[in-house]
Amino acid sequence: MVNPDGVIHGNTRAELTGIDPNRVWKKTSKNVTPSIHHIKKQIQKTKEETCLILDLHSHSKKLGCFFYGNYSQSDVKSFRLFPSTVCQEDIRFCYKNCRFRGGNDSSARKALFNELGIPNIFTV
């Protein structure tokens, strides 16, 4: 868990510092966002062996289980294969609620995809 201090104090998104840890992945700081900085460094070290990253979240308005994924016009099927398979195998996941778009450039999903080229990064 990346944000236990914020959650313990009732924050759903922000750490005690007031920073949303899912909006700093594009430019991390060892001093300001140490947890994200070190997680990102570990992912960078193992990017060749990494085939899937799941960024687990709750949603403030949407109910149920679904995926948010990245988008590639040249390879639509492979970007949707994992979510499609999970949705077929587990009735708790609903494919019609999944979204495959660009997203926020500073989110883990988008920043790691842009920097490392790992296609299978999903917010769940």
Predicted segments — roles?
Residues 1-123:
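Structured catalytic-domain cores with a bias toward divalent-metal coordination
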